[in-house]
Amino acid sequence: MPTLGVNIDHVATIRQARRTVEPDPIAAAVLAELGGADGITVHLREDRRHIQERDVRLLRQTVRTHLNLEMAATAEMVAIALELKPDYITLVPERREEITTEGGLDVNGQPERLQTVIDTLQQAGIPVSLFIDAEAKQIETAARLGAKFIELHTGRYAEAGSPQAQQRELETLAQGCARAIDLGVRVNAGHGLTYWNVRPVALLPGMEELNIGHTIVSRAVLVGMERAVREMKQAIQGTF
């Protein structure tokens, strides 16, 4: 079964709604790990709408599993990553007007720029993952650029309007996963996964890690972070 990376961005979203000090994402990360999280994921956005640079610095010192930093491929973010050296980086697309990340990174449209960023980070010992749609050309370009991982965007699967549409999207994810593995690229997945739709994605051959945030934080508001994480681990394993 794939491991679970818990995205704690929306703990910071609640905090930033009042520009106060609580809830504390660092405390949430500790509780998530106590609940069985295999990793902690945060997205340091250029507009700092939720996670702040201070959060990432503190998480780097306190996370005991591994820290996955999601970021845009900008000079500012590369400099921060080189200083803090998270366990790995996931490069994601970013638009200020979006509520959350919408769609995968277009690696075909910017190979030279991404090559520079990937080389810079990986030469510093930080493995790079690319958050992309499960499209053959995107996956092949990601492999050619030397990314160690891809993270397949599962939003279309999660938002499918019927069981038939969801099954088609699952098949697309399966094909993408298989193609990446054939090319020697390791595979993670995430976006829109919930307690009720995660199991089929978890069963895809070769899937290594699922990065899940909003549904866990939403449940944690009601039942607590440790229990919410334990129950997601159960959902991944098919025992929820």
From Swiss-Prot:
EC number(s) given by UniProt: 2.6.99.2
GO BP, one annotated term: pyridoxine biosynthetic process
Cell compartments where the protein resides: Cytoplasm
GO cellular component: cytosol
Coiled-coil regions listed in the entry: none
Pathway(s) it belongs to: Cofactor biosynthesis; pyridoxine 5'-phosphate biosynthesis; pyridoxine 5'-phosphate from D-erythrose 4-phosphate: step 5/5
Tagged with keyword Transferase: yes
Listed name of the protein: Pyridoxine 5'-phosphate synthase
Taxonomic source organism: Cyanothece sp. (strain PCC 7425 / ATCC 29141)
